[in-house]
């Protein structure tokens, strides 16, 4: 598995259209930065209390990421450029989490 992205957003400050745009944009961006195809996104709109408008949690395969800090910088840089290109205004926090996955598919 390449990466699993969870986007949590506050519907008071972020529209569903903006969340959809971000979901598709960040999926492609992470695929490009990591050079992997297996990247999927969940966008959620739970009750948000005293949190920033958009939190993005990116779980990556620990075995494939040698330097999480460098990966975070690369993703942040590309995301910043994407925001400008798409006139995307809401602030975004990103969190990169290397994980060791053990999974079975299609059970």
Annotate each PLM feature.
Residues 11, 60-62, 98:
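Non-catalytic surface loops within mature trypsin-like serine protease
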């Amino acid at each position: 598995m390449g990466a699993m992205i969870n986007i949590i957003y506050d519907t008071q400050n972020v529209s569903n259209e903006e969340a959809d745009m971000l979901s598709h944009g960040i999926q492609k961006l992470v695929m490009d930065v990591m050079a992997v195809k297996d990247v999927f996104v969940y966008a959620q709109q739970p009750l948000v209390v005293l949190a920033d408008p958009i939190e993005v949690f990116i779980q990556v395969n620990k075995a494939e990421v040698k330097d999480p800090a460098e990966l975070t910088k690369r993703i942040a840089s590309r995301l910043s450029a994407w925001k400008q290109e798409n006139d995307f205004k809401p602030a975004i926090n990103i969190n990169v989490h290397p994980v060791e996955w053990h999974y079975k598919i299609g059970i």
